[in-house]
C-alpha cells in the first residue's frame, strides 16, 4: 500500500473517530496552510528535485568515485559509498549504492548476505545526522527544535551505530586497500550544493531558502539540459514526497485537534514521567517497524514526547531508536530492494542485522544516559 494513502487513511480514520465535521475540515486545511507545514512540504519537494538531478545526471556516482579515488582503506571505502548515496533522501535509495558495494565485496570475498547487510546498514547512517533529510525536517517541525540542532544531538548516537556496523564484517575488512574507478578531483565540486544547503540551515536560515539556494547552485554546476531538469522536477517521486509529507503532517494536526496528547498524558498522571516517556518511545519503535517508515511513526509520537517533556535529547533518542526499528522492517523499501539486488533472503541478512541492531539499541541508550545530561 502506498505510504501516503496509508497515512491519510490513518489520519482520516482517527479524525472521524475523534473530531466533528468542522474540525475534520479544519485539520486538513491547517495541514496545508500552517507556516511550518508549508516549509516542510516545499523543502521536501525541492530536496527530491535535487536528488533527481544528482541521479539522472550520474553526478552522484562521479562524486562518489572522486571522493574514493584517494581512499585506500577497505573499511572506509565500503562504508563510505552507501553513506554518500544516503545524501540523496529518496525512497529505495539503497539500490543506487548496491552495484558499487557489490563490486567492492567481490574484491574482498565478502559474500552476498554480508554485502547486502553492509549496503543497508551504512546507507542509513547519514539520514539521522543530515539536516536536509525528511525525517529530521519533520521531527524539527513537530518538536519545535532546529533541524541542525537535532542533527548535532544525533551525532554521538550515529557514531555508535557506525562502530557497531563493522562487527559482522570485521574479518573480511582485514584487507588494507581496494581499487576504485578513478575520477578527476574536480568532481568534488559537486558536493558544494549539499554543503551550501546544510551550512545555511546550520546558520538558522529558513529551510526553504537553504535548499533553494542548494538547488540553484546545483543547477549552475551541473548545467542540466532542459529535458533533464523537467524530468527531475515533474517527477512522480516529487509528487509522492509532497503527498507523503502532507499525509504525515495531517496525522499531527488531527492529533492536536483531538487533544489526544493531553489525553494520553492524563492517563498516566499517577505514573512517573520516565515510564510515560519510555512507553512512547517503545510505541514509536513498534510503529516504525510495522509501518516500515520513520516519518509515519514520528508524526504520531514526537508530539506526545514533547507534550511530556521539552527535551531535545529525548526527541533525538526517539528519532534514532525509531529509525533503527524502521531500518529492519520487512516492509522497508530499501531492505526489500537490496534483498532483490543481491539475491538473498530476509533470514540470511537478519542474522547480521538483528544482532547489530539490538547491540546498537543498548549502546545508544547507554550513550544517552551518560552523555546527554551534560549537553
Task: Please tell me what each predicted stretch does.
Residues 5-8, 41-42, 76-80, 151-152, ...:
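Hydrophobic alpha-helical transmembrane segments
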Residues 23-106, 230-308:
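Membrane-embedded alpha-helical segments and adjacent helix-loop junctions characteristic
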Amino acid at each position: 500500500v502506498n505510504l501516503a494513502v496509508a497515512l491519510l487513511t490513518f489520519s482520516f480514520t482517527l479524525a472521524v473517530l475523534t473530531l466533528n465535521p468542522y474540525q475534520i475540515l479544519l485539520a486538513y486545511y491547517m495541514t496545508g496552510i500552517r507556516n511550518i507545514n508549508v516549509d516542510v512540504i516545499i523543502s521536501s519537494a525541492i530536496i527530491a528535485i535535487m536528488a533527481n538531478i544528482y541521479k539522472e545526471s550520474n553526478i552522484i556516482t562521479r562524486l562518489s568515485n572522486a571522493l574514493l579515488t584517494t581512499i585506500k582503506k577497505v573499511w572506509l571505502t565500503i562504508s563510505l559509498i552507501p553513506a554518500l548515496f544516503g545524501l540523496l533522501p529518496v525512497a529505495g535509495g539503497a539500490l543506487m549504492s548496491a552495484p558499487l558495494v557489490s563490486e567492492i565485496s567481490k574484491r574482498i570475498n565478502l559474500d552476498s548476505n554480508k554485502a547486502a547487510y553492509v549496503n543497508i546498514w551504512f546507507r542509513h547512517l547519514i539520514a539521522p545526522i543530515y539536516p536536509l533529510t525528511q525525517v529530521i525536517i519533520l521531527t524539527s517541525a513537530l518538536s519545535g527544535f532546529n533541524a541542525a540542532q537535532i542533527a548535532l544531538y544525533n551525532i554521538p548516537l550515529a557514531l555508535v551505530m557506525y562502530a557497531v556496523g563493522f562487527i559482522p564484517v570485521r574479518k573480511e575488512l582485514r584487507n588494507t586497500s581496494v581499487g576504485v574507478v578513478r575520477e578527476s578531483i574536480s568532481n568534488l565540486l559537486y558536493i558544494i550544493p549539499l554543503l551550501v544547503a546544510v551550512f545555511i540551515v546550520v546558520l538558522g536560515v529558513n529551510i526553504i531558502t537553504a535548499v533553494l539556494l542548494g538547488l540553484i547552485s546545483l543547477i549552475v554546476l551541473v548545467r542540466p539540459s532542459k529535458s533533464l531538469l523537467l524530468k527531475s522536477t515533474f517527477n512522480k517521486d516529487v509528487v509522492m514526497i509532497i503527498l507523503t509529507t502532507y499525509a504525515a503532517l495531517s496525522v499531527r494536526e488531527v492529533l492536536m485537534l483531538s487533544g489526544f496528547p493531553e489525553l494520553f498524558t492524563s492517563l498516566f498522571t499517577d505514573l512517573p514521567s520516565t515510564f510515560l516517556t519510555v512507553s512512547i518511545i517503545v510505541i514509536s519503535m513498534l510503529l516504525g517497524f510495522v509501518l516500515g517508515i520513520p516519518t509515519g511513526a514520528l508524526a504520531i509520537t514526537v508530539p506526545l514526547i514533547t507534550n511530556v517533556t521539552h527535551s531535545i535529547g529525548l526527541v533525538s533518542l526517539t528519532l534514532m531508536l525509531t529509525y533503527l526499528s524502521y531500518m529492519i522492517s520487512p516492509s522497508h523499501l530499501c531492505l526489500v530492494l537490496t534483498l532483490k539486488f543481491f539475491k538473498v533472503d530476509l533470514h540470511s541478512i537478519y542474522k547480521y542485522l538483528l544482532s547489530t541492531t539490538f547491540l546498537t539499541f543498548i549502546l545508544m541508550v547507554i550513550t544517552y544516559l551518560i552523555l546527554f545530561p551534560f549537553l
